[in-house]
From Swiss-Prot:
GO MF entries: quercetin 3-O-glucosyltransferase activity; quercetin 7-O-glucosyltransferase activity; UDP-D-glucose:delphinidin 3-O-glucosyl-5-O-caffeoylglucoside -O-beta-D-glucosyltransferase activity
Stated family: Belongs to the UDP-glycosyltransferase family.
Key word Transferase present: yes
Annotated positions binding UDP-alpha-D-glucose: Q338, H353, W356, N357, S358, E361, D377, Q378
Keywords: Glycosyltransferase, Signal, Transferase
Signal peptide range in chain numbering: 1-15
The protein's Enzyme Commission number: 2.4.1.298
SUPFAM superfamilies, sorted: UDP-Glycosyltransferase/glycogen phosphorylase
Record-listed an anthocyanidin binding positions: H16
Catalyzed reactions per annotation: an anthocyanidin 3-O-beta-D-glucoside + UDP-alpha-D-glucose = an anthocyanidin 3,5-di-O-beta-D-glucoside + UDP + 2 H(+)
Active site positions: H16
The protein's name: Anthocyanidin 3-O-glucoside 5-O-glucosyltransferase
Source organism of the structure: Verbena hybrida
Domain of life per record: Eukaryota
Length: 461
């Protein structure tokens, strides 16, 4: 009997690559051959061997016309258009070549990330079944679904008390995915609509969600037409279930380390337990100069040791007026191993943009958060983090609405770090979710069982 073979197509952004690679490793550990399909830009920067893959993961790349990545000033609309047209052809060619390859096992199933919705249509042309790998919380998919299925008027009305079905929390405007806000370009909303229309082309489509049952029990069941399957947290084994101690990274970092980045862990070890404030806003957020200054002021006013990841374009320098003062209190780097940082004993809290990977990692490691959401799913994640899971606090912008003042940043950090009643409750809640995340990934845990059932059904494992 030939080995099962799954093609995994993923958008070439860090937030997509990380969970997709981890999912690929899970498949390989189940003795499934994986073809990992992404752009040349991502492939060039990725580790070609994933930990625990047993040689079962191979990479296929295609040129999207932006082989050096999307650069400042590039046309985003053209980028997505080229990605789609070239990706469709490349995926079709890959599947056709596999059909006639006598040496390789035949691809029998396609999994795709949400900006590659066209991959499902290509799969259908080759009479292959497919599933969406949803890399945000189930709640975000629910909101999009309800928006395009009868609730657009309520959401568009500008209310700060939006009631949706499925047991979702009451939402304010700032809690919505940014693609649904009036300030967002219509093409982003169209991308989400296209994804849902793709799912509608199947009966009871399967959606693999990077979450776990205990975290979103209602959201995972809110859409009757979908079968949402929680398989997360999609985090390297060494940091979660411990089944593979060698699996200590995602294996696909798209960013280069700076010259002073390697000693992060050594520096962390010089600080007391639970004392360090970690600040990182992910791979896509470009923080304004004025906001950088306010973050710096907030950190200095706290007086606590901090590790701050500041991404700059190649050849640029970090320009903050109080840089020398900052260096005396904390450490500024362009890159760090976030998994190593979040699991370090000296870490006290995470000031985060609330991207889902960062949020889920914090939950899985029991790290309380200060939420600093920017766009897409981050406002929703911050809402869930503060009001549903109660593992942190969310900053409020000033009256102009464009900048979060240093005083507000300091206030939020102190709420998490000062050891008072609220701080204690946040840490207790964070510890509870840490335990539940680990239970989901135990041998008989919910996410492990969910994946087993899925694989048994779709590939006959």
């Amino acid at each position: 009997m030939s080995r099962a073979h799954v093609l995994l197509a993923t958008f070439p952004a860090q937030g997509h690559i990380n969970p997709a690679l981890q999912f690929a490793k899970r498949l390989a550990n189940a003795d499934i051959q994986v073809t990992f399909f992404t752009s040349v830009y991502a492939w060039r920067r990725m580790s070609r061997t994933a930990a625990g893959s047993n040689g079962l993961i191979n990479f296929v790349s295609f040129s999207d016309g932006y082989d050096d990545g999307l650069q400042p000033g590039d046309d985003g609309k053209n980028y997505m258009s080229e990605m789609k047209s070239r990706g469709i052809k490349a995926l079709s060619d890959t599947l056709a070549a596999n059909n006639v390859d006598q040496k390789s096992s035949k691809i029998t199933f396609v999994v795709y990330s949400h900006l590659f919705a066209w991959a499902a249509k290509v799969a259908r042309e080759f009479h292959l079944r497919s599933a969406l790998l949803w890399i945000e919380p189930a709640t975000v998919l629910d909101i999009f679904y309800f928006y395009f299925n009868g609730y657009s008027d309520e959401i568009d009305a500008g209310s700060d008390a939006i009631h949706l079905p499925g047991g979702l929390p009451v939402l304010a405007q700032r809690d919505l995915p940014s693609f649904l806000l009036p300030s967002t370009h219509e093409r982003f909303r169209s991308l989400m609509k296209e994804k849902l229309e793709t799912l509608e082309g199947e009966e009871k489509p399967k959606v693999l969600v990077n979450s776990f049952d205990a975290l979103e029990p209602d959201a995972l069941k809110a859409i009757d037409k979908y079968e949402m399957i929680a398989i997360g947290p999609l985090i390297p084994s060494a940091f979660l279930d411990g089944k593979d101690p060698s699996d200590r990274s995602f294996g696909g970092d798209l960013f280069e380390k700076g010259s002073n980045d390697d000693d992060c862990l050594e520096w962390l070890s010089t600080n007391p337990r639970s004392s360090v404030v970690y600040v990182s806003f992910g791979s896509f957020v470009n923080t304004t100069k004025s906001q950088m200054e306010e973050i710096a002021r907030g950190l200095l006013d706290c007086g606590r040791p901090f590790l701050w990841v500041v991404r700059v374009n190649e050849g640029e320098e970090v320009l903050i007026s109080c840089m020398e003062e900052l260096k005396r209190v904390g450490k500024i780097v362009s890159w760090c191993s976030q998994l190593e940082v979040l699991t370090h004993p000296s870490l006290g809290c995470f000031v985060t943009h609330c991207g889902w990977n960062s949020t889920l990692e914090s939950i899985s490691f029991g790290v309380p958060m200060v939420a600093f959401p920017q766009w897409f799913d981050q406002g929703t994640n911050a809402k869930l983090m503060e009001d549903v899971w109660r593992t942190g606090v969310r900053v409020r912008a000033n009256e102009e609405g464009s900048v979060v003042d240093g005083d507000e940043i300091r206030r939020c950090i102190e709420e998490v770090m000062d050891g008072g009643e609220k701080s204690r409750k946040l840490r207790e809640s964070a510890g509870k979710w840490k335990d539940l995340a680990r239970k989901a990934m135990e041998e008989d845990g919910s996410s492990v069982n969910n994946l087993k059932v899925f694989l048994d059904e779709v590939v006959g494992i």
